[in-house]
Amino acid sequence: MTLESISSGGRVRDALSGSPKVAIVTGASSGIGLVGLEKQRPNNEEEVPVVLLHGTSGQSEDWSQVVEQLTKHRPVIRLDYAEPVAGTDSVDAPRVSDFADRVVAAAGAGGRHRFDLVGFSLGAAVATFIAAEYSEMVRSVVLVSGFSYGADPRMRLQFDLWLHLARTDKTALGKLLLVSGLSREFLSAFDENTINGIIQSFVAMNDWPLIEQNIRVDLAVDVREQAKKIKAPTLSITGKYDQIVPPFYTQELADLIPTAKRAEIPSGHLSFMEKPVDLASAMLTFLLEKHP
C-alpha cells in the first residue's frame, strides 16, 4: 500500500480515480491524458516502453522521481488503473484480473502491444497476472515489494486492520502507514509538525471508497499459479526495511517464478519515495542488460 499523500518535499497529492489514465510528460511540463509516453529523448515509435503500476492507495504520480531517471533511457507509461466501483462489499468489486485487463486495454489503446512491466506492491500482483496471462505483450517484468497471496495469515491481518481503520479511524491508518511504510532513518528526517500535516492531508484528500475497494482486492490476491507460468525475464526488488511486505514475501513470490532474479534496496516499503535513484538504477540495470 502506498501513501500517496507524501512527496519528497512533504507536499500533498490529490488522489486520482476513474478510468485508466496515463501521465504524459514532455520536457518539464506534465498533464494527464488517456494514453501517452514520457520521454526525455527523441521519439522512436518502435522503442518498447516501460509500463509502471502503482500500489493499493497509490497513483501514477507516485513514480515521479523514478520516472525522472527512467526517461533518460526509456519511454515510460504510468497508469492509474484502479477504477472505483460502487459498493466495495459487492461481489462485483474488482479483482486483480480486472485491473490486469484494464492495464492491457489502456496500453493497447495507445498502440502499445509490447512493453516492459513494473509493478509495486498490489501493482506487482497485477503485473504478475499480466505477465502470465498476456505473455505475448510482456517483454520483461520488475516486481517491487511484491506478494503472491493476500490471505496469508500475516498479510490478511494487516489488510483487515487497514480496512477497519479506513472505515473507523482514518487518522490512525495514516499514522500506521507512516510507521510501517517508511524506514526509521527516512521518517526521522520529518519534524513533528510535518508529520502531523502529512497525516491530516492523508485523511482529508484521499478517495476513501477507492482505498477500501483496493484493500479488498489486496485480501483477494492470489497469483501463485500465475507466477509459476511467467516466462519473461523477471526481477524481484525487495525493500530491506519493508514492514508492509517484509522481504520473506518478495522472496516467496520470486521463488515461484522460474526466471526471477533478485535485488535489494536499502529502504522501507515506499522505495519509490525513499530511494528513487537506487530503485530506478536497479530497474535500468536489469532492463538494459536484457534489452540494450
Tell where the protein language model's regions lie, with residue ranges:
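Active-site loop/oxyanion-hole signature of alpha/beta-hydrolase fold enzymes
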Residues: Q65-E68, I77-V118
